[in-house]
Swiss-Prot record:
Organism domain of life: Bacteria
Annotated protein name in UniProt: Erythronate-4-phosphate dehydrogenase
Recorded GO MF terms: 4-phosphoerythronate dehydrogenase activity; NAD binding
UniProt organism field: Alcanivorax borkumensis (strain ATCC 700651 / DSM 11573 / NCIMB 13689 / SK2)
The keyword Cytoplasm is annotated on this UniProt entry: yes
Length: 371
C-alpha cells in the first residue's frame, strides 16, 4: 500500500508496518505527486476535489481535522472514494485556547469572569466542551446551533437564535464553514450583525476565518466601535491583513488546536479508519512520557491563567504572528509558523496536585481529567 501524507502530521509511524508512507507539503500538493498512491492523508491546507484526484488511484482519503470544508465530499462519494476525518481530535486544545483568551480579555476589561454572559455559537465537539468549561467557571452560557435544535437537543446549554445572543458579553465561534443552505455559516457575522457588537463585548473565532466578514470587522474596529477580538483564523489565510492583526487584541496562525495530543489523536483516528477499511494494521496507541507534577495553588483568575500558561501562552503566538508579517513573504511565513510550531501539551499531560479554592475546583477537575 502506498500512502501519501502531509509532512506536518505526527504519529505516522504505525502506518509504516503495512505501507510505504511518503510525506509531502500539503499546501502545494499536486495530482502528479499522487502517482500510484492508494491513500491520501491531509490537513485543512489541502483542497481535496476532482481537480486533485481525478485519474489517480486514490481509494481512501483521510483528513486529520474536525472540519471538512476543504474536502469535496460529493465528489468523493461519486468517485467511490472512502473518506474519514477526526471530529473532536483537538477539542481540548481549542477549549484551552478559548479559556485562556477569555481570561486575558476579561483581565483587559477589568471584568470578573464569573457571571459574564457567553454565547457559544456551534455546539459540536469543541463548542460543547467550551460551554461546559465556561459554565464551570460560573459564567452564564447560552448556545446557538439550529441544526442541533432541529434534532430536539435537550442538553445542558439553553439554545437561542444567533440574533438573540448578540448582546452577550463574550461571543465564541465553533461552527463548520458552509457556504450554502438555510444555515450557511460563511459571513455568519456580517457587517449587519457586527454593527450590533460594541467595545464592551468580546469576540473569539477559532473555527474558520470566513465565518466572520473580516473586512467589515476591520472597518468596525478602525472606527473604535468594535468588540475586543481574538482571531486564530483569518478569511484570507495564509495571508493575514496587517491592519486587522494590529486591530485585534490577540491573533494567532490557525493553531488553536495544535496540541501534540490533539495532532496525535487525529492521526490515530485516521490510522484506525485505514485499518478498518483495508483490513491491515493493529490497534493504535501512542504512549506519552511521564511529566512532572504541577502544584501551583489556584485561588484566583490570575492563578488559573498562570496555570494555563504553563502549557501554552497565547501572547507568544500573537508575537510570532506579528513578526511573520514583516517577512518578505508573509504567507510562506504563516505556513512556517504552523509547520515548525513548538511542542505544546494539553494540561492533562501533567498530574496536578496543587491546592484549589472551591470556586475553581470544577474547572480544574475538567482541565486535568483524562480523555
Amino acid at each position: 500500500m502506498h500512502i501519501i501524507a502531509d509532512a506536518n502530521m505526527p504519529g505516522l509511524e504505525p502506518f509504516e508496518a503495512f505501507a510505504t508512507v511518503e510525506r509531502v507539503d500539503g499546501r502545494s500538493l499536486t495530482r502528479e505527486q499522487l502517482g500510484d498512491a492508494d491513500v491520501l492523508l491531509v490537513r485543512s491546507v489541502t483542497r481535496v476535489d476532482r481537480a486533485l484526484l481525478a485519474g489517480s488511484q486514490v481509494k481512501f482519503v483521510g483528513s486529520a481535522t474536525i472540519g471538512t470544508d476543504h474536502v469535496d465530499l460529493a465528489y468523493l462519494s461519486e468517485a467511490g472514494i472512502q473518506f474519514a476525518h477526526a471530529p473532536g481530535c483537538n477539542a481540548r486544545a481549542v477549549a484551552e485556547y478559548v479559556l485562556q483568551a477569555v481570561l486575558l480579555l476579561c483581565a483587559r476589561q477589568g471584568r470578573e469572569v464569573q457571571g459574564a454572559r457567553v454565547a457559544v455559537v456551534g455546539l459540536g465537539n469543541v463548542g460543547r466542551r467550551v460551554a461546559d468549561w465556561l459554565s464551570a467557571l460560573g459564567m452564564e452560557v447560552r448556545g446557538c446551533d439550529p441544526l442541533l435544535d432541529a434534532q430536539g437537543y435537550a442538553g445542558p446549554v439553553a439554545l437561542a437564535p444567533l440574533d438573540d445572543l448578540l448582546d452577550a458579553d463574550i461571543i465564541t465561534l465553533h461552527v463548520p464553514l458552509t457556504q450554502s443552505g438555510e444555515h450557511a455559516t460563511g459571513h455568519l457575522l456580517d457587517a449587519s450583525r457586527l454593527s450590533r457588537l460594541g467595545p464592551g463585548q468580546m469576540l473569539i473565532n477559532t473555527c474558520r476565518g470566513p465565518v466572520i466578514d473580516n473586512l467589515a470587522l476591520s472597518q468596525q474596529l478602525a472606527s473604535g466601535t468594535g468588540p475586543m477580538t481574538v482571531l486564530d483564523v483569518w478569511e484570507t489565510e495564509p495571508q493575514v491583513p496587517a491592519t486587522l492583526y494590529q486591530q485585534v487584541v490577540m491573533g494567532s496562525p490557525h493553531i488553536a488546536g495544535y496540541s501534540l495530543e490533539g495532532k496525535l489523536k487525529g492521526t490515530s483516528m485516521l490510522y484506525d479508519a485505514v485499518c478498518q477499511w483495508s483490513g491491515q494494521g493493529i490497534a493504535s496507541g501512542t504512549a506519552m512520557a511521564d511529566a512532572p507534577p504541577l502544584n501551583p495553588a489556584v485561588n484566583s483568575e490570575a492563578d488559573l491563567l498562570a496555570l494555563l500558561q504553563v502549557a501554552y501562552r497565547l501572547e507568544d503566538d500573537h508575537r510570532r504572528l506579528g513578526e511573520s508579517l514583516h517577512d518578505t513573504d508573509p504567507s510562506a511565513a504563516f505556513d512556517r509558523l504552523r509547520k515548525h510550531y513548538p511542542v505544546r501539551h494539553e494540561l492533562h499531560y501533567w498530574q496536578y496536585d496543587g491546592s484549589v479554592d472551591d470556586t475553581w475546583r470544577a474547572i480544574i477537575s475538567r482541565l486535568f481529567e483524562p480523555d
